[in-house]
């Protein structure tokens, strides 16, 4: 882990690497969870309402496992409500990750990004990541299952819509708004979130009607964690086999790290993996110079001195001085956040 120790203290003793490996093995053998057969059916874009009009899903005969207990790969998830409304206590009941990470667009009812819906345009996928993936695993089915390439899937995509920044033409499609095509009695076509089919009374506001579960832990992560701790290949190979890839014959840290990168892409784990491997600064620095557009202006990504920033701070945020004061000095400021000339 981050602290490079074989054991860490707990309230009633210590927790060792061997203890964690044993817990993971128990989960693998006795939990009832398992890898589901098709990686692509884990994600809502394969839902039955979107499927007929989304060629990628229809041509591959995909069928969503859903979120009602049939998906035995999901171990722990965060559920969301169909009752979100605009007030301080209820707006958060919808999945705002989907909202943040869907493309910007001026009209939520258009076909431009289908099946992707409209959102706030955060987190376009880096071409550098796709190049790495293509080079490492050219036949990996998870790449197209995870990334929406507008050049391939959206001929009517509008670049620079609603002043989109950091635009690469690549969007992740694991956690984003997913639309369905709706044709009324007069033959008029519109598009709306698939949640409107599951819960017809849900608010039509695209900022309130994303209800996809956030999966915090799934079984493939358990398998990969066990392989990492035990330096064995069985977990890695189970994940690779499902993705249509050749099994590896010997464990290596590089193979494990790549497998986590591809299998768990866009699921909120990569940053913490990079931190605990002490690779975050180098990985972020590689994004310098990556091509993208800001509101139709061609630019390149500028991460500046991000490697030094991560080195100085260890990747940790600044502890608010008010909290340090309240602790009467028990809390100490994180490294890299002291002095009169803070860079960050």
Regions found by a protein language model. Give the residues of each.
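Extended, hydrophobic/aromatic-rich amphipathic alpha-helical segments that build helical scaffolds
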Residues: 1-29, 76, 140-148, 213-239, ...
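An aromatic- and glycine-enriched ligand-binding surface/loop that stacks and positions planar moieties
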Residues: 1-167
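Extracellular/surface-associated beta-sandwich interaction domains
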Residues: 12-17, 24-28, 34, 187-196, ...
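Acidic surface patches and DE-rich sequence motifs
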Residues: 29, 184, 241, 311
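Alpha-helical junction/boundary sensor with strong preference for TPR arrays
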Residues: 31, 243-246
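Long, intrinsically disordered, low-complexity segments
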Residues: 45-105, 206-216, 237-240, 248-344
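Coil residues (strongly favoring Ser/Thr
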Residues: 108, 185-186, 313
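Flexible, polar/acidic helix-loop-strand segments at domain edges
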Residues: 124-217
């Amino acid at each position: 882990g981050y602290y490079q120790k074989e054991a860490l203290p707990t309230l009633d003793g210590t927790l060792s690497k061997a203890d964690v490996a044993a817990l993971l093995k128990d989960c693998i053998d006795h939990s009832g969870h398992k890898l589901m057969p098709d990686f692509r059916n884990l994600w809502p874009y394969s839902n039955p309402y979107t499927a007929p009009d989304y060629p990628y899903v229809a041509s591959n005969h995909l069928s969503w496992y859903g979120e009602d207990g049939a998906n035995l790969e999901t171990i722990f998830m965060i559920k969301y409500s169909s009752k979100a409304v605009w007030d301080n206590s209820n707006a958060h009941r919808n999945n705002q990750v989907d909202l943040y990470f869907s493309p910007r667009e001026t009209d939520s009812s258009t076909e431009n990004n289908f099946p992707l819906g409209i959102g706030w345009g955060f987190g376009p996928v880096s071409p550098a990541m796709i190049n790495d993936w293509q080079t490492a695993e050219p036949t990996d089915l998870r790449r197209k299952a995870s990334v929406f390439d507008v050049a391939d899937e959206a001929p009517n995509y509008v670049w620079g819509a609603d002043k989109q920044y950091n635009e690469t033409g690549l969007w992740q499609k694991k956690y984003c708004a997913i639309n369905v095509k709706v044709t009324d009695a007069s033959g008029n076509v519109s598009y709306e979130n698939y949640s409107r089919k599951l819960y017809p009374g849900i608010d039509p506001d695209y900022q309130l009607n994303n209800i996809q579960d956030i999966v915090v832990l799934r079984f493939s992560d358990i398998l990969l964690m066990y392989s990492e701790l035990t330096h064995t290949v069985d977990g890695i190979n189970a994940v690779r086999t499902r993705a249509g890839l050749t099994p590896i014959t010997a464990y290596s840290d590089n193979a494990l790290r790549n497998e986590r990168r591809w299998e768990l892409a866009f699921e909120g784990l990569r940053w913490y993996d990079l931190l605990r491997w002490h690779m975050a600064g180098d990985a972020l620095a590689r994004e310098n110079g990556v091509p993208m557009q800001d509101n139709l202006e061609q630019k390149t990504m500028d991460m500046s001195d991000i490697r030094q920033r991560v080195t100085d701070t260890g990747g940790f945020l600044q502890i608010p001085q008010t909290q340090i004061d309240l602790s009467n000095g028990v809390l100490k400021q994180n490294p890299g956040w002291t002095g009169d000339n803070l860079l960050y």
